[in-house]
Amino acid sequence: MNYLPQQDPQVFAAIEQERKRQHAKIELIASENFVSRAVMEAQGSVLTNKYAEGYPGRRYYGGCEYVDIVEDLARERAKQLFGAEHVNVQPHSGAQANMAVYFTVLEHGDTVLGMNLSHGGHLTHGSPVNFSGIQYNFVEYGVDPETHVIDYDDVREKARLHRPKLIVAGASAYPRIIDFAKFREIADEVGAYLMVDMAHIAGLVAAGVHPNPVPYAHFVTTTTHKTLRGPRGGMILCQEQFAKQIDKAIFPGIQGGPLMHVIAAKAVALGEALQDDFKVYAKRVVENAKRLAAALQNEGFTLISGGTDNHLLLVDLRPQQLTGKTAEKVLDEVGITVNKNTIPYDPESPFVTSGIRIGTAAVTTRGFGLEEMDEIAAIIGLVLKNVGSEQALEEARQRVAALTEKFPLYQD
């Protein structure tokens, strides 16, 4: 940064402190990652100046010939990555991508079947405090109380009973592979559309280390950050028959001008995801998650569903008589960032919770491997088994610092 320190030292200071925080702490929040310098450079480019309402070749402003190139690159790269017939890269977020699908196929009050938020779903899958739960009649499905795996018999039974117009698959805190073929089978049985929200697993899908929902779903939504390792934003993939409706739902339906600098960053990230080294990265993300899960179990922690198939895991802290809120706070004090998270059938409120959610996408980007997963689990065990012990916390801080110094981040 050459201009910001002089132009606005207060904003620069806050950004610099955040850069130092990201370097000094171990990032285990499952929805976060570290983008490349190229992605950041694209997002900070002159494209931030350009208004471009509409779509490539059909804009409502002049001077769009170069941003058209950028948006076409993003769309074509996404099609290639996921095997989609049509892609819209303009959604500002995953929530707006979901909203656009709802506006495409639903009317106010229509019935939708979605995953219970406390069982691993998302706010936009029907939470009563979200527009989705306010605008539509959401019926919830969840996980088996014993296995904590999606109960597909329950999904089928509720689909038959309520005859939803749309079924939503996908989650924000579900550590197992979702059977997309089973969901499509159920949707076809009751005449429903199927939407898959793959925001958390998109990078794993792109790399071929997780099943691809595109062949099964009428609509697939995603964020472009998380495991896809791009800028914060959204994207919709759909069958060609819905292309015009989806594009119209985004613009002029729920958005005006697209963020062309962000779309440029999406194009860069999608280009990165097409490379062989991204496939290696995604494979390591899953390997690290499985290793971390096993190491935490060796430390005596209980994992929801007994482990993980993707990049995230949920830890049930009730055996340790801890809340997620307490664990999040004390781990942050030693330099490990996680988030408190509800677990299935959680007796605590969403502001307290009985669990924490942990992900390996960011630490894998940083270069952490299997040995580091063992050490992270040991540090978490040290801290959560000795809450209130300053000696234990100080030891944990030193061990965290040793790891972060070994794998520097954004230091040049």
From Swiss-Prot:
Q: Which UniProt key words apply to this protein?
A: Amino-acid biosynthesis, Cytoplasm, One-carbon metabolism, Pyridoxal phosphate, Transferase
Q: Name one GO cellular component term.
A: cytosol
Pfam families hit by this protein: SHMT
Cofactor(s) for this UniProt protein: pyridoxal 5'-phosphate
> Its pathway?
One-carbon metabolism; tetrahydrofolate interconversion; Amino-acid biosynthesis; glycine biosynthesis; glycine from L-serine: step 1/1
Q: Which SUPFAM superfamilies match?
A: PLP-dependent transferases
Q: Which InterPro entries match?
A: PyrdxlP-dep_Trfase (IPR015424), PyrdxlP-dep_Trfase_major (IPR015421), PyrdxlP-dep_Trfase_small (IPR015422), Ser_HO-MeTrfase (IPR001085), Ser_HO-MeTrfase-like (IPR049943), Ser_HO-MeTrfase_PLP_BS (IPR019798), SHMT-like_dom (IPR039429)
> So where does (6S)-5,6,7,8-tetrahydrofolate get bound?
117, 121-123, 349-351
Q: Please tell me where this protein is predominantly located.
A: cytoplasm
Q: What class of enzyme is it?
A: transferase
Mention one GO biological process in which this protein takes part, according to its record. Answer: tetrahydrofolate interconversion
Which residues carry the post-translational modification N6-(pyridoxal phosphate)lysine, per the record? 226
User: What does it catalyze?
Assistant: (6R)-5,10-methylene-5,6,7,8-tetrahydrofolate + glycine + H2O = (6S)-5,6,7,8-tetrahydrofolate + L-serine
One GO MF term: pyridoxal phosphate binding
Q: Where in the cell is it found?
A: Cytoplasm
- Identify the domain of life: Bacteria
* Family recorded in the similarity comment: Belongs to the SHMT family.
Question: What interactions and quaternary structure are annotated?
Answer: Homodimer.
UniProt function note: Catalyzes the reversible interconversion of serine and glycine with tetrahydrofolate (THF) serving as the one-carbon carrier. This reaction serves as the major source of one-carbon groups required for the biosynthesis of purines, thymidylate, methionine, and other important biomolecules. Also exhibits THF-independent aldolase activity toward beta-hydroxyamino acids, producing glycine and aldehydes, via a retro-aldol mechanism.
Q: What is this protein called?
A: Serine hydroxymethyltransferase
Per the UniProt entry, what species is this protein from, by scientific name?
A: Geobacillus kaustophilus (strain HTA426)
